[in-house]
Amino acid sequence: MSFGRDMELEHFDERDKAQRYSRGSRVNGLPSPTHSAHCSFYRTRTLQTLSSEKKAKKVRFYRNGDRYFKGIVYAISPDRFRSFEALLADLTRTLSDNVNLPQGVRTIYTIDGLKKISSLDQLVEGESYVCGSIEPFKKLEYTKNVNPNWSVNVKTTSASRAVSSLATAKGGPSEVRENKDFIRPKLVTIIRSGVKPRKAVRILLNKKTAHSFEQVLTDITDAIKLDSGVVKRLYTLDGKQVMCLQDFFGDDDIFIACGPEKFRYQDDFLLDESECRVVKSTSYTKIASASRRGTTKSPGPSRRSKSPASTSSVNGTPGSQLSTPRSGKSPSPSPTSPGSLRKQRISQHGGSSTSLSSTKVCSSMDENDGPGEGDELGRRHSLQRGWRREESEEGFQIPATITERYKVGRTIGDGNFAVVKECIERSTAREYALKIIKKSKCRGKEHMIQNEVSILRRVKHPNIVLLIEEMDVPTELYLVMELVKGGDLFDAITSTSKYTERDASGMLYNLASAIKYLHSLNIVHRDIKPENLLVYEHQDGSKSLKLGDFGLATIVDGPLYTVCGTPTYVAPEIIAETGYGLKVDIWAAGVITYILLCGFPPFRGSGDDQEVLFDQILMGQVDFPSPYWDNVSDSAKELINMMLLVNVDQRFSAVQVLEHPWVNDDGLPENEHQLSVAGKIKKHFNTGPKPSSTAAGVSVIATTALDKERQVFRRRRNQDVRSRYKAQPAPPELNSESEDYSPSSSETVRSPNSPF
């Protein structure tokens, strides 16, 4: 008993023990329960226990083998995660994509990989862990990729300690200042969402006006005055949400302010002609001079004003009037300014401080307006950084190894992360497309681009858009791509005068040949749809399809769990999240075949409610309604049914599709009845007129893996999803292979009796 009391009193001061023993004692020598040390400790221990139970443990998680991922901080508490499995599920939603952890998070390792975590109790406050799937632990210096500023509250006991521990107390002002090294004087344009023409204001951000993300949001609310009240969200013109203060100081300088209301990309993020003119008038010379005013020591109330005050003083006009006077001065930051200190870092990002988004939305006006002060400013920037302006208007130098072999022409496509230029091989006069990916736009996600390019390197097939050549430099990645000029699949159908089952059969023959080749390499495309099927016109007048856009493609070495793709063409096993493989491409091809023969998809939702569509896909009930299918052969319907089987094992493989009579011409009807599907395709799909026949091919090339992040969607699982998914009957007479490992065909794959 005495030993227990000594243990209990360890946390008390030794000099108070004697007083506590003698004070309030009774005749029997026992201390009074009211004043005893035991009673005091009992109350303290209870409060500490309750506090520790409620307190969240802050830990950092990395992705196994991902040397570019800086980790994500999680607050682990019993209220948030009731079980270890719940934590794994949440980590899967956060960390899994089509490249990293495609099978989901199934294992958590300690940072050294020596131990596997199996319960929440094993997670230690402030430590770091590595999330993996079924692959072995990959030993990397994960903590070397982490910015030490990932927590303001870190207190290290020694400089050599690899992993910092987190403290619960808030850091002091000095720590906060250290974490604002990214702040530099910058003038941003804020456009309010809503009916056009929209109000816009310019706000100066610097270390005096940008104290925190919440404070900047408050200042923007005061300046922009949304009809719906408080500004809840900010987006770049690319649709990326601004999540923290540092996002204001990236490459973007135009932001859309939104309240709690819903928004549509085509309505809110696309600027009309008047808004382009207004944005273009935002001279970067003005920004530079405003930056100098923000950094120099000058008396007056402007140094103490908040962002809205800075807005009016900097602009000199009301917020809705964005035109500024032209100035011939070019920005030249002082040797001690943040701009000069970061000159080397800016050059690694691609150089000019001009926003890619603002350049993109005003490109059509720039072609007609002639050279202006902004062009002269960009030319000075390019000369300062050693770029050859005459070779590239976007501000990057094309490597000599490419210009020696190819004549690079005008820009024909502009995506979120890539630019596409005309490219003609000098020796053969053959026309290609030069895809230029700016690495500054992909910072932190380079692995996604690398995955796409690595797959393009491996594939070489007459029904696949080819990668001809690549060149990797520190600031850009150059890809010489095959340019397909015949439009996409929908263009071919809607523009033809006569369209029959034989044409549809030839199209499926081309598509199945490409899928067969990919599956023989264990590559799954995951985004097969008409927009990614381009029409190639041969010299003899015949046509064939080429499959492009490998942004979601990946190697299959086990079940995949990432829910991604285009909803109309997504397979049921993807939605059910039970694990999927190569045959999701066959399902998509089956949906396309159905559309080719009637003009509308087999599974249709109601409005924007994707759950209705997903439920139909999970059921897998394929109907052939009259009169749309009255003139279609039974052989075609049979093939579609076999391609759209919910049971993956019974679903056709690519080899079986190619061997089917309807595809190899044996099952085609003798009387070629013309199919009237063009009007239905125009009604059910967005197939508006394109500016040129090459627009579809350029659009496919301009797309990158980073654009596909929007196609990774999440669906709340219903309790009966798996039961419905597994309950579908399968024809017992078929015993097809579960995967397609057939060798690839080396000859040009074209249906012998069809233009395709």
UniProtKB/Swiss-Prot annotation:
Acidic residues: compositionally biased ranges: 366-375
E.C. no: 2.7.11.1
Residue ranges of the region described as Disordered: 288-393, 711-756
GO molecular function: ATP binding; protein kinase activity; protein serine kinase activity; protein serine/threonine kinase activity
Annotated SUPFAM superfamilies: Doublecortin (DC) (SSF89837), Protein kinase-like (PK-like) (SSF56112)
Active site feature: 527
Positions bound to ATP: 412-420, 435
A GO cellular-component term linked to this record: glutamatergic synapse
Keyword Transferase tagged: yes
Positions carrying Phosphotyrosine: 536
EC class name: transferase
Listed Pfam families: DCX, Pkinase
Bias (Low complexity) ranges: 297-313, 347-364
Modified residues (Phosphoserine): 32, 36, 305, 307, 330, 332, 334, 337, 347, 352-353, 355, 364, 392, 742, 751, 754
Domain Protein kinase stretches: 406-663
Chain positions found as Phosphothreonine: 46
Bias (Basic and acidic residues) ranges: 711-723
Catalytic activity: L-seryl-[protein] + ATP = O-phospho-L-seryl-[protein] + ADP + H(+); L-threonyl-[protein] + ATP = O-phospho-L-threonyl-[protein] + ADP + H(+)
Keywords: ATP-binding, Developmental protein, Differentiation, Kinase, Neurogenesis, Nucleotide-binding, Phosphoprotein, Repeat, Serine/threonine-protein kinase, Transferase
Domain Doublecortin residues, every copy: 57-143, 186-269
InterPro entries: Doublecortin_dom, Doublecortin_dom_sf, Kinase-like_dom_sf, Prot_kinase_dom, Protein_kinase_ATP_BS, Ser/Thr_kinase_AS
Protein task: Probable kinase that may be involved in a calcium-signaling pathway controlling neuronal migration in the developing brain. May also participate in functions of the mature nervous system.
Family as reported in the entry's similarity comment: Belongs to the protein kinase superfamily. CAMK Ser/Thr protein kinase family. CaMK subfamily.
Protein name according to UniProt: Serine/threonine-protein kinase DCLK1
Originating species: Mus musculus
Taxonomic placement: Eukaryota, Metazoa, Chordata, Craniata, Vertebrata
